[in-house]
Amino acid sequence: MNKTKRIEILTRLREQNPHPTTELQYNSPFELLIAVILSAQATDKGVNKATEKLFPVANTPQAILDLGLDGLKSYIKTIGLFNSKAENIIKTCRDLIEKHNGEVPENREALEALAGVGRKTANVVLNTAFGHPTIAVDTHIFRVCNRTNFAAGKDVVKVEEKLLKVVPNEFKVDVHHWLILHGRYTCIARKPRCGSCIIEDLCEYKEKVEF
């Protein structure tokens, strides 16, 4: 795909959604961090159902530590892998207090040193909480980038590298949200909704479907 097409795609996505953000509900960098840890192999909707009960009770590292492991599990037991996620969250809260004065660090190395936080989670927090031009590639973004040929790559790291290379700076802060929402609601895994897609004429997918 050439540069002109990419810029037109980004322009249309921006016109459709000028101020995109995550569908996870949060009111602080810490709440976002916990929500993103919980979202691995889970839906944002499922995470929001759990955190809307958890956060009014515990939305700081110390408050979650005060809940204890079993107390935390009682709030997140509807989410897949809740046992391991609870253990990671407890460890992360302890580290935030001991190493970061209870605050979420604004750098990748410190974030990725936290339990349950990998590159993708760190990218989401840096981008969404702090406005960094990072791009977290999940299954939706991976599919959209390869299917449309916007930024094809054999794995998520390659797609991330390609996106950082081909997306102009003015679009970098928002492109993660545009692509994830496009993949979640239009360019879905099975039977993509090509007929209602605002970038259908620019997409290079050879098996477009009319829906």
UniProtKB/Swiss-Prot annotation:
GO terms for biological process: base-excision repair, AP site formation. The keyword 4Fe-4S applies. It holds the Pfam family HhH-GPD. InterPro entries: DNA_glycosylase, Endonuclease-III-like_CS2, Endonuclease3_FeS-loop_motif, Endouclease-III_FeS-bd_BS, HhH-GPD_domain, HhH_base_excis_C, HhH_motif, Nth. Its cofactor is [4Fe-4S] cluster. GO terms for molecular function: 4 iron, 4 sulfur cluster binding; class I DNA-(apurinic or apyrimidinic site) endonuclease activity; DNA binding; DNA N-glycosylase activity; metal ion binding. Keywords: 4Fe-4S, DNA damage, DNA repair, DNA-binding, Glycosidase, Hydrolase, Iron, Iron-sulfur, Lyase, Metal-binding. It catalyses: 2'-deoxyribonucleotide-(2'-deoxyribose 5'-phosphate)-2'-deoxyribonucleotide-DNA = a 3'-end 2'-deoxyribonucleotide-(2,3-dehydro-2,3-deoxyribose 5'-phosphate)-DNA + a 5'-end 5'-phospho-2'-deoxyribonucleoside-DNA + H(+). Residues 108-127 form the HhH domain. It comes from the Bacteria. [4Fe-4S] cluster binds at residues 187, 194, 197, 203. Binds 1 [4Fe-4S] cluster. DNA repair enzyme that has both DNA N-glycosylase activity and AP-lyase activity. The DNA N-glycosylase activity releases various damaged pyrimidines from DNA by cleaving the N-glycosidic bond, leaving an AP (apurinic/apyrimidinic) site. The AP-lyase activity cleaves the phosphodiester bond 3' to the AP site by a beta-elimination, leaving a 3'-terminal unsaturated sugar and a product with a terminal 5'-phosphate. HAMAP family: Nth. PANTHER family: A/G-SPECIFIC ADENINE GLYCOSYLASE/ENDONUCLEASE III (PTHR10359), ENDONUCLEASE III (PTHR10359:SF18). Belongs to the Nth/MutY family. This is Endonuclease III. It comes from Haemophilus influenzae (strain ATCC 51907 / DSM 11121 / KW20 / Rd). The gene is nth.
